Regions:
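Conserved catalytic core of nucleotide-sugar-dependent glycosyltransferases
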Residues: 92-107, 122-200
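C-terminal catalytic/acceptor-binding lobe
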Residues: 1, 7, 174-283
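Hydrophobic targeting segments
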Residues: 3-8, 46-47, 55-60
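Short loop/turn segments at strand-loop or loop-helix junctions that form parts
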Residues: 5-22, 62, 146
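Active-site-proximal specificity loops/subdomain of glycosyltransferases
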Residues: 19-30, 34, 61-113
Length: 283
């Protein structure tokens, strides 16, 4: 009835994206080493631990990726035959490469689902199952999971709740007739789309905040126990141990928590109101 593709971009060259939030150059060997570390510790184990394995993970790397990094990537993905690496000519070739593979792979399949995840983030073990449960043979329907967590891993470790509408974990159900795929537009452009389902009863993603994020800052809130969620968000044993031992107690950042809670909920309500009254352009 459908085929489901989880899609991730990695080190694709982009003329509009060349520095971190700390003004450090992106896509250097140092950057790549750090990013593969995040990927192998957070993103990969969370995707590999999905209860539902009826999907393919398409990962797109730049064609200029150094040979030693390619070897490391292939070794990481080798245990998982439904995880596939592609080496392409930068961001300019990204969307066309997605469509080319899916067109060939999904022949005679009436519907497709495409989901996105950043290479340094994490998903709940039921993420794929929950997305597929929304499938009702819709010709075009975006799925926006509003609730998740924010985990800062450096310089200090903090964990909190987070809400984010039109977020980077969005999915798209489509009839398989020249499908656009979820990556045809940036995630924040889904505010213009009227054909959209919101899932607000589960926290199904975890945004990882680190010093080399392009834009994100830690804005988690409330007292969340790592022990309560670590069996749902699977990370490496090394990271699990590190977080368990070094997480800062909520009482030590209570003021920041309150500030973040007010800010996150203000932004959420503001965007919902703008959507409701039609301030965003509706397609």
């Amino acid at each position: 009835m459908f085929k489901h593709y989880l899609i991730t971009r990695f080190n694709l060259k982009n003329k509009n994206w060349d520095v971190t939030k700390n003004n450090e150059t992106l896509l250097t060997r140092e950057w790549m080493t750090h990013r593969i570390g995040l990927f192998s510790n957070f993103c990969l184990p969370s995707v590999a631990s999905q209860i539902n394995t009826n999907f393919k993970w398409l990962l797109f790397f730049d064609a200029t990726t150094d040979a030693d990094f390619k070897t490391e990537i292939e070794a990481l993905l080798k245990p998982y035959p439904h995880f596939k690496a592609f080496y392409i000519d930068g961001m300019d070739a990204f969307h066309s490469s997605i469509k080319s593979y899916i067109t060939d792979d999904s022949k005679n399949t009436p519907y497709i689902i495409t989901s996105r995840i950043d290479n340094d983030d994490c998903i709940h073990k039921d993420y794929i199952s929950t997305i597929q449960q929304q499938f009702k043979s819709q010709d075009f329907m975006a799925i926006d999971i509003l609730k998740g967590y924010s985990l800062q891993v450096s310089p200090d470790i903090m964990l909190g709740k987070k809400e984010h509408i039109f977020n980077p974990f969005i999915s798209l159900i489509e009839k398989n007739e020249t499908p656009k795929t979820v990556w045809f537009s940036d995630h924040n452009m889904w505010k213009k789309e009227s054909r959209r389902i919101e899932i607000a009863n589960q926290r199904l993603w975890m945004s990882i905040i680190h010093e080399k994020n392009k834009v994100n800052e830690f804005d988690g809130y409330d007292n969340v126990s790592w022990d309560d969620i670590k069996t749902d968000f699977i990370v490496s044993d090394e990271i699990n141990s590190k977080v368990s031992k070094n997480i800062i107690p909520h009482k030590e950042w209570r003021y920041l928590s309150l500030k973040n809670k007010l800010y996150v909920n203000y932004v959420l309500m503001s965007k919902k109101l703008k959507k409701a009254v039609g301030l965003y352009k509706i397609k």
